[in-house]
């Protein structure tokens, strides 16, 4: 992602505008906790990234037959904390929450996500990394309480264009979904730098079913998100998108926003000064 520095007031203004736009769509707040196509770059050594994922399902499922809460008018807040340990390894931790009209906020569950990256010094023609995410959620939010995801990540910058492909594999470790084995859930992003500060593009999120045999088309989920990224500062991350469901099994309208901030807690080593002779 390209980063540029704007004055502090501009950063606050950009954040306020996006947040207010999303706030007025919110009535209450389920099933979409982290909607993001990953880039291959990991958080630098000694840096901690804190992200807030805000997702509101404006038009989703109003009923369910598995005892979980429906997604319609579900508002999700996810806190993601990621720390970089060296130039090729990071670990992320997620805290999922959900809110609905009349029920207040609920703790949903937590995941942990270690990720490895091909070091830049290898000079591969594309960026490559691999993440694994494992975690647990409460039964009222999913029949399959324990889950595991393997996510290969390949990306490339071509002039003003940016492409990223995440052919993720997901598996339930408990519950009725365990017998389905690994399921194919590809994500893809294409973006174009409209200016040095604004990237506009499309994000795709899908779930096709088990590798042993994909689900019928009507049971698959496919979503397209027109999205923008604001490159306001090397320390900040902003992403906003509106998701449109393309099948009957997909939530039909979702608003998402990601706000992230990088913190460098480790003190830089001071250079020794030579004493005059």
Question: What residue spans do the PLM features occupy?
Answer:
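Charged interaction patches that mediate protein-protein contacts
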Residues: 1-2, 96
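Bacterial N-terminal signal peptides that target proteins for export
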Residues: 2-15
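Generic hydrophobic-segment detector
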Residues: 4-6, 19, 29, 36
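Low-complexity intrinsically disordered segments
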Residues: 7-8, 22, 32, 76
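Bacterial N-terminal signal peptides
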Residues: 13-23
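Membrane-interface motif at the C-terminal end of an N-terminal transmembrane signal
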Residues: 24-28
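Transmembrane beta-barrel domains of Gram-negative outer membranes and organellar outer membranes
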Residues: 29-277
């Amino acid at each position: 992602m390209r980063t540029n520095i704007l004055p502090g007031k501009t950063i606050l203004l950009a954040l306020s505008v996006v947040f207010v736009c999303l706030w007025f769509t919110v009535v209450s707040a389920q099933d979409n906790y982290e909607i993001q196509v990953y880039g291959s770059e990991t958080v630098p050594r000694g840096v901690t990234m804190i992200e807030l994922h805000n997702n509101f399902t404006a038009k989703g499922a109003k009923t369910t037959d598995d005892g979980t809460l429906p997604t319609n008018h579900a508002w999700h807040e996810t806190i993601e904390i990621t720390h970089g340990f060296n130039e090729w390894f990071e670990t992320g931790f997620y805290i999922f929450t959900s809110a609905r009209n009349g029920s207040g906020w609920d703790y949903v569950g937590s995941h942990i996500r270690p990720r490895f990256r091909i070091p830049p010094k290898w000079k591969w023609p594309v960026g490559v990394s691999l993440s694994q995410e494992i975690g647990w959620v409460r039964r009222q939010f999913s029949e399959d309480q324990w889950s595991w995801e393997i996510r290969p990540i390949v990306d490339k910058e071509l002039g003003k264009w940016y492409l990223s492909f995440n052919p993720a594999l997901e598996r339930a470790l408990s519950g009725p979904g365990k017998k389905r084995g690994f399921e194919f859930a590809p994500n893809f992003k294409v973006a174009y730098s409209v200016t040095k500060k604004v990237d506009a593009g499309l994000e795709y999120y899908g779930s096709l079913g088990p590798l042993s045999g994909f689900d019928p088309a009507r049971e698959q989920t496919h979503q397209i998100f027109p999205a923008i990224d604001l490159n306001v500062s090397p320390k900040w991350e902003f992403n906003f998108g509106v998701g449109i469901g393309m099948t009957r099994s997909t939530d039909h309208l979702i608003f998402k926003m990601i706000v992230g901030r990088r913190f460098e807690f480790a003190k830089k080593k001071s250079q020794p000064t030579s004493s005059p002779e």
